[in-house]
Amino acid sequence: VFCCMVTPPNRQGFVNLGLTNFYSMETIKAGRASGKQRLTIGEVNDQMPVIFGDNWLHVSEFDFFVENSSPMPVFSRVQPGEAEKRIAGHVLELINNGDTFQMGIGAIPEAVVSGLSGKHDMGVLTEMFPIGLPDLISKGIVTNSRKPFHKGVTVATFCMGDKAMYDYVNENPVCEFYPASYTNNPAFIAQHPNMVAINMALMVDFSGQIGRASCRERV
């Protein structure tokens, strides 16, 4: 059984995956293609934003729908401390005008986003849509004009933030979401010159290996 939240169907009978694509679309299509008995359930939420890109599925891909009307979960912006700001200062020295960046979640990426105010013509190819990105776009810092693909468009897989962010991405043609197999494909990422990835680390060993998913009991 696979269940995911979707928007109400449009006039053509397509629902939208909204705030998160990840592997939902490919899981549903792979289940259909396998020929095995699998149930696909869509939770229709009329408060789910509609986000463009490869983010649509026809109602025929689902076996059942259930209706719900509840607000999206909201997450406040992380407030970087002095240490995070100093680390971000070193990171910002490695980011140049016209670079395409990927941003993770956490205090350091948040500090980096805040420090990009002096840059211009930045592009975004990322898994997570950063919470501070709408400000960068409105100020002309992020234009996506120099990317070899999806010019003028921010490409991501999911977003988690506050209501202002959800209102921003809703039916906004400069934001497109795609499955993670597309945004996170190393071969696709490698075709972007001057690609910069900024993520948090939970631990680093003496050989320089970095762990970012778990550290002892912390995940």
Name these PLM-found stretches.
Residues 1-218:
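Conserved alpha/beta enzyme-core scaffold
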